[in-house]
Regions:
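Extracellular/periplasmic solute-recognition and catalytic clefts
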Residues: 239-249, 258-312, 334-335
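Aromatic- and charge-enriched surface segment that lines or borders ligand/interaction sites
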Residues: 102-158, 315-316
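N-terminal lobe/hinge region of extracytoplasmic solute-binding protein
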Residues: 57-107, 151, 231-232
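Long beta-strand-rich cores associated with HINT superfamily self-processing modules
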Residues: 517-543
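Extracytoplasmic/peripheral linker and loop segments enriched in polar/acidic and small residues
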Residues: 419-430, 455-521, 543
Length: 543
């Protein structure tokens, strides 16, 4: 079973084989696209209220089903099952038509022409048919919405290669200048300013789903915010949407899952993932323990525990950070319990950027060996003993990393005669102080939200939250440049940023935290995104 993590909003875990089901707006169907790439094939069993139902616990009930803006995990899960796009991937990773009959790509890679299927329409709530046909104009309107500043779409960055996209987003050119045009009701043409080898991959993202302009305008600002202002072009339709959950259905067909329940775990909060599945409270569940289980499990990692130095404190000194970082690397053993592994960088192994393995493309980011003692002595020339009086190493209680923090602290005492306290605080306090910069050193979990390398690195910029108070114009410039690049160029720019963070000892990656999805036997053809988490049940069956 191979795992590939994507630098977008999902990664797909494909269980068994696909069988596409597509539903009917003004003239086409849209298959709920898989937004990230991690392809697996395995079997799962769903539990729920019906014989062919699937229940998934969400942190919060879906609130926004507008595919051009959906980014919260529950919203993306819903969009995954409500909408279809131009193309989709089969289990082998090959792209195949979804709402289109076929497509053509120019020899220079700058023009893509899609020929849409005829006669497809959107489906309203309760499975009611509509007269809204899916046409090429729906895709034109959807992409124009992506590049409206007021939309604030998280997907715009993925389509930076579209002709005039930056100028349209900045308001310097009209929407009509965007490189997406309709040549008739069923012919859609994309014009790129630079070739993007992963353009088809990006067309599986929610933001690339069709949007009927007439229907959108009729909702008067409530598009995707309630059942009556939403239309389905994918596998499922909205059956009910209340404060209790979002309930999706489709017409029964053999062993296909025909009911998807997105609800909160309100009555079984004390049960483990394995217990929830065994007690038929849910059909699959993420698990962050290493407890033995007979259930099928899928392991992955999106989090790296790292030492963080607050650059607004005494650790504004790069030499001091580098000295302590050098001594800390390898000082702590990987915590027991099976949840952790030694980190190879800040970005977890397995993530991809534009379909490319990030780590393989970006290369090794391990800082070169340094003379830690010499760096420390250089730093001390501008520091006094009193500068270290309030330094502590903050860790979250119950995380299992306190012993590692104490080992590192012991090495600093031995190597530099620095006596810091290890400060263990509850999880809520830890998160609050980290966000407010109220710490000097912290051993903290740094996550790649949505499986995105960019999102992970952006946390170290002022615009992204200023996690450590690090302010470097080169870092910010290169990270911003990565949003305009694609493929290997994007990987290299992101790799340079990661390398700079580690060389400057802003963050010192220590342990990759392992997670897993637990699944009960019997469910097949499930597409799973551990970073959302996102589930696509278009082809999921229950034996």
């Amino acid at each position: 079973m191979s795992i590939v993590f994507s630098d977008r909003f999902r990664y797909t875990l494909v269980v068994s084989s696909y069988k596409e089901r597509i539903f009917l707006k003004h003239s086409l169907i849209r298959f709920s696209a898989v937004v990230l790439t991690i392809a697996f094939v395995f079997a799962l069993t769903g539990c729920g209220s019906g014989s062919n139902s699937f229940t998934w616990f969400v942190d919060c009930i879906p609130a926004n089903l507008d595919p051009q803006v959906a980014s919260a995990s529950a919203d993306v899960i819903a969009c995954e099952n409500l909408y279809s796009g131009l193309v989709r991937k089969d289990p082998s990773g090959k792209y195949e038509p979804a709402l289109c009959e076929r497509w053509e790509k120019s020899s220079d890679g700058l023009t893509y022409t899609f020929y849409l299927k005829d006669g497809l329409t959107y489906t309203a709530a309760k499975g009611n048919a509509t007269d809204y046909a899916i046409t090429a104009e729906d895709f034109v309107f959807a992409f124009r919405r992506l590049f409206r500043a007021e939309t604030n779409s998280p997907y715009a960055v993925e389509f930076a290669a579209l002709e005039n996209s930056a100028a349209v987003l900045a308001g310097q050119m009209p929407e009509s200048a965007l490189g997406v045009t309709a040549s008739g009701p069923l012919t859609l043409v994309f014009h790129l300013s630079s070739a993007d080898d992963n353009f088809l991959e990006k067309l599986t993202l929610p933001g690339a789903m069709p949007c009927d302009e007439e229907f959108f305008n009729s909702t008067r600002g409530t598009y995707g915010l309630n059942a009556s202002s939403s239309l389905s072009s994918g596998s499922f339709y909205i059956y009910n949407w209340t404060a209790s959950g979002l309930f999706l259905r489709r017409a029964p067909s053999d062993s296909l899952i025909d009911s998807l329940r997105l609800v909160q775990n309100t009555n079984s909060a004390g049960q483990s993932a394995a217990e929830l599945i065994a007690n038929e409270k849910c059909s699959a569940a993420p698990d962050d323990t290493a407890a033995p289980t007979t259930l099928t499990s899928l392991s992955y990692s999106d989090t790296t525990w790292s030492l963080l130095f607050n650059c607004s404190s005494v650790f504004a000194s790069t030499e001091l950070r580098q000295a302590l970082a050098s001594a800390a690397r390898g000082a702590a053993e990987v915590p027991d319990g099976g949840l952790y592994a030694a980190a190879n960088g800040l970005v977890p192994d397995g993530l991809t950027v534009d379909g490319m393995n990030y780590r393989d493309t970006a290369g090794d980011v391990t800082p070169a060996a340094v003379d830690a003692r010499a760096l420390y002595l250089t730093a001390r020339q501008t520091l006094t003993t009193s500068d270290f009086n309030k330094v502590s190493l903050m860790v979250p209680a119950g995380s299992g990393v306190t012993s590692a923090a104490e080992e590192i602290n012991g090495v600093w005492q031995k190597e530099f005669s620095l006596f810091f306290s290890v400060e263990e605080v509850d999880e809520e306090t830890f998160a609050k102080r980290l966000a407010e910069g109220d710490y000097t050193i912290a051993l903290a979990p740094i996550s790649a939200e949505g499986g995105s390398v960019y999102n992970m690195l952006n946390q170290f910029t002022a615009a992204g939250g200023g996690l450590t108070g690090y302010a470097d114009s080169l870092y910010a410039t290169q990270l911003q440049a990565s949003t305009q690049a694609t493929g290997s160029s994007r990987c290299r720019l992101l790799g340079d940023c990661e390398r700079q963070l580690l060389n400057d000892a802003v963050a010192v990656p220590l342990f990759a935290q392992q997670k897993r999805l637990l699944i009960a036997p019997g469910i097949q053809n499930l597409i799973f995104d551990p970073f959302g988490p996102v589930l696509d049940l278009a082809y999921t069956t229950k034996e």
